[in-house]
């Protein structure tokens, strides 16, 4: 029986074999590597991955799809909302210090998923995700550009990222109304040590009114914390590079 894509899960299934091959080449799976796929759907990407890996763990929320996937002898199925999955526990279950994570992420919750994985980054070797191209543009954006924001700062602090493949809407069934792309995310080996909640709060405050100078937003936040250091608040949030936000978070941690 044909599976009808569910709008509430943001389901758009990959159907272009050329694009699927290109994604698998970008991921470059090796036999025996511990890998987790988020949102395997109809297994378009799952099958070529598991053929190369030998075994694959998948996270699927849709009950009907999870039941189908369980019939595959080489898949370990976690039927769950990915935002509730403890990836440290998954790595432990796979007896792996670090796991590779891949997926065609549901576009309606892609940012929460990225932040959830950020909290588990210590057990992640790398990530390859299909996302809305506009989201990837924000992830890799440079300072002083309109795409640069909270997502750019939080992810660039912890990952080296690159857009590795453009994916047009007609590669999916049903086609989304947006362009897509594949991003590669490799955690930095020696990231700057800081309190992630402090960086998150600091960046959220800074970009809360991005048109205003930081003295109206972040300046007040720093005053409330009795910050005694120096930081130029006569700038807009988008003008401050990641390294300066990180240094400020370290001083406030």
UniProtKB/Swiss-Prot annotation:
One of its GO terms (molecular function) is 16S rRNA (adenine(1518)-N(6)/adenine(1519)-N(6))-dimethyltransferase activity. S-adenosyl-L-methionine binds at residues 12, 14, 39, 60, 81, 104. Pfam families: RrnaAD. Its EC number is 2.1.1.182. Gene3D superfamilies: Ribosomal RNA adenine dimethylase-like, domain 2 (1.10.8.100), Vaccinia Virus protein VP39 (3.40.50.150). SMART domains: rADc (SM00650). Keywords: Cytoplasm, Methyltransferase, RNA-binding, rRNA processing, S-adenosyl-L-methionine, Transferase. It comes from the Bacteria. One of its GO terms (cellular component) is cytosol. It is found in: Cytoplasm. It catalyses: adenosine(1518)/adenosine(1519) in 16S rRNA + 4 S-adenosyl-L-methionine = N(6)-dimethyladenosine(1518)/N(6)-dimethyladenosine(1519) in 16S rRNA + 4 S-adenosyl-L-homocysteine + 4 H(+). Belongs to the class I-like SAM-binding methyltransferase superfamily. rRNA adenine N(6)-methyltransferase family. RsmA subfamily. Specifically dimethylates two adjacent adenosines (A1518 and A1519) in the loop of a conserved hairpin near the 3'-end of 16S rRNA in the 30S particle. May play a critical role in biogenesis of 30S subunits. This is Ribosomal RNA small subunit methyltransferase A. The lineage of its organism: Bacteria, Pseudomonadati, Pseudomonadota, Betaproteobacteria, Burkholderiales.
């Amino acid at each position: 029986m044909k599976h009808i894509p569910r709008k509430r899960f943001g389901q758009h299934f990959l159907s272009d074999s050329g694009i699927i091959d290109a994604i698998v080449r970008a991921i470059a799976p090796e036999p025996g590597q511990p890998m987790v796929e988020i949102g395997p759907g109809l297994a378009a990407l799952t099958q070529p991955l598991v053929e190369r890996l030998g075994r694959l763990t998948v996270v699927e929320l849709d009950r009907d799809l999870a039941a189908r996937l369980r019939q595959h002898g080489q898949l370990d199925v976690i039927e769950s909302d990915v935002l509730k999955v403890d990836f440290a526990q998954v790595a432990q279950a796979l007896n792996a210090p670090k796991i590779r994570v891949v997926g065609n992420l549901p576009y309606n919750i892609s940012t929460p998923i990225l932040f959830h994985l950020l909290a588990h980054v210590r057990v992640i070797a790398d990530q390859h995700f299909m996302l809305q191209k506009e989201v990837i543009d924000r992830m890799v954006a440079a300072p002083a550009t309109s795409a640069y924001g909270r997502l750019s700062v939080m992810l660039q602090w912890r990952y080296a990222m690159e857009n590795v493949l453009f994916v047009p809407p007609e590669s999916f069934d049903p086609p989304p109304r947006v362009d897509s792309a594949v991003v590669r995310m490799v955690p930095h080996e020696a990231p700057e040590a800081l309190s992630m909640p402090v960086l998150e709060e600091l960046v959220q405050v800074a970009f809360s009114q991005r048109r205003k100078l930081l003295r109206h937003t972040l300046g007040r936040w720093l005053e409330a914390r009795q910050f005694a250091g120096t930081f130029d608040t006569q700038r807009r949030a988008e003008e401050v590079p990641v390294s300066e936000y990180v240094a400020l978070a370290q001083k406030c941690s």
